[in-house]
Amino acid sequence: LLGLWGCTAAPVKELPDNVKLSEPQSRMGSTVRLVDAVTFERQGAVKQSPATCVSLNVDNSEVTLSDSSASFVGSYTGTYYDIESSRKEGGGATLQHADAESGVVVAKGVTEYTSGGLMPIGHAARYKLLVAPMPGKTVVQFKDIEYAQKSTGYMENTGFQRLGTWWGSGVMDAYAAMEQQADKVLDCIYSESLIGE
């Protein structure tokens, strides 16, 4: 088990330049950093309302987290009792603030991703999203990013925690999911029409 943890706690060495990290800190014998923000931008003049595009493309649904940590083998019968528990976390309104004059939008969202090669592990990342139109470009920034493994099997599911640079967080897969989310919002903002053909 410790050998496996060592693989998951090992830090990811290179992240894209648009990822802002915290100061280094120790985690299970490795030096890692937390992800403070991930920022994307696109050049051009805004064509659609950022608030509308966030409402159409960002979801803040509840996430179901589960485990089977209460499972046991009966002492007299030797029968295995698989006791799965689950709970829902998060949810609520997506839009937190929308300024019609400046176009600035603050929202909460969640996206799901998988990490791990041969044995994919389902994760969810929740975040605060800032969309800020500026002269000649629009910035989309993810902050307060937390992740959780959706099912932890026989280990207790401790829920969401800050996203960091260790392999076990699936940080690069989380990054790809955020990039895809940002692209959806930006594609909408720069589209000629909100009505699909």
What are these regions (language model features)?
Residues A10-S71, S169, D173, S191-E197:
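Terminal, regulation- and interaction-focused segments at domain boundaries
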Residues P120-S169:
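Beta-strand/loop substructures that line and gate deep hydrophobic ligand-binding cavities in soluble
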Residues N157-E197:
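C-terminal partner/receptor-binding element of secreted or periplasmic proteins
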Residues D82-P135, V139:
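Surface-exposed short loop/turn segments
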